[in-house]
UniProtKB/Swiss-Prot annotation:
Belongs to the MraZ family. It comes from Shigella sonnei (strain Ss046). Residues 5-52, 81-124 form the SpoVT-AbrB domain. Pfam families: MraZ. GO terms for molecular function: DNA-binding transcription factor activity; transcription cis-regulatory region binding. GO terms for biological process: negative regulation of DNA-templated transcription initiation. It is found in: Cytoplasm, Nucleoid. Keywords: Cytoplasm, DNA-binding, Repeat, Repressor, Transcription, Transcription regulation. This is Transcriptional regulator MraZ. Forms oligomers. One of its GO terms (cellular component) is cytoplasm. InterPro entries: MraZ (IPR003444), MraZ_C (IPR035644), MraZ_dom (IPR020603), MraZ_N (IPR035642), MraZ_sf (IPR038619), SpoVT-AbrB_dom (IPR007159), SpoVT-AbrB_sf (IPR037914).
Amino acid sequence: MFRGATLVNLDSKGRLSVPTRYREQLLENAVGQMVCTIDIHHPCLLLYPLPEWEIIEQKLSRLSSMNPVERRVQRLLLGHASECQMDGAGRLLIAPVLRQHAGLTKEVMLVGQFNKFELWDETTWHQQVKEDIDAEQLATGDLSERLQDLSL
């Protein structure tokens, strides 16, 4: 399980160094193999360990290619999916087209989200967090049933 937000830097080749606390888990569970794709709702990337991505692929394969909305989701997620292998120094090379999609340049937020990571441009991440907090403060009881059961 991945949690927390960590500032990491992209090097001149577009590689990011995976924080040490995640490396062993990624090597053990995915042999360092990852899949990166776009987030279809936010300007960030989704980074999955390969076994987790394979579960997503199975779900995507069950969508109908005859339904335009389902086909669009397949096209966006699968069409942008790029495999990346963690090297001996714990770095992952993020494809240029993906970096461009998310506006990643130097400072990147690696955000743990249970079974995957989100990759955000640092400035965009902080803006999104502010928007989310503001929206939550303005919310007036529109909690889903699952959120109503969440006790912190």
